[in-house]
Amino acid sequence: MMNKNYIKYCSILVMVCTTLAFAQTELNFTNAGATGQNGPTQTQINTAYDGTTLDDDVTINTQGIQEWTVPATGTYTFEVYGAQGGRSYLYGTSSWHDGGKGAKAVADFSLTQGDVLKIMVGQQGVEYARADRGAGGGGGSFVVLSSGTTLLMAAGGGGGAGD
């Protein structure tokens, strides 16, 4: 079974430092529990972010791509994680191989109030219960500055397990 702690961190964390006093806010963008080849819907996002600092601040105009407007000019630290690959049944035993863990990337960016970011959070690869094929790879996670479609960050997903 997939490491439960890794599921919690397969997300995009954005830490905002907007004042000289270094007040910090942490935003945690997730895949909202979406599975398969399509990302989350607006309904899934609304449910996942209800009661959080992202409540009512994220929209989905294209399924799977979250759009968020930068609320204040400042330096933003991004931690971007790719999703883990799916697990696969180990031939001749009653055990499973876990898929590879996704990459992690960290960087700081100066953003301006009103900038719109397009955020895609990878989803875990599909597991495979037969011993003759491998599981699906994890999805990559991406952050794009939508004004010029400039890629700010990317983290690749892990490979799917095989026999």
PLM segments and residue spans:
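Bacterial Sec-dependent N-terminal signal peptides
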Residues: M1-Q24
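Boundary/junction segments of secreted and surface-exposed precursor proteins
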Residues: A21-Q44
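Short, solvent-exposed loop/turn elements at domain surfaces
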Residues: G36-P40, G86-L90, A161-D163
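Extracellular beta-rich ligand/substrate-recognition surface
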Residues: D50-T62, T93-K101
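Extracellular and analogous surface-interaction loops
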Residues: D57-Y76, A107-D115, V143-S147
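A short beta-strand element within beta-rich, extracytoplasmic domains
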Residues: T75-Q84
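Extended, low-complexity, turn-rich repeat/linker tracts enriched in Gly/Pro/Ser/Thr and Asp/Glu
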Residues: Q84-Y89, G125-A129
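Secretome/extracellular-domain signature
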Residues: G99-D163
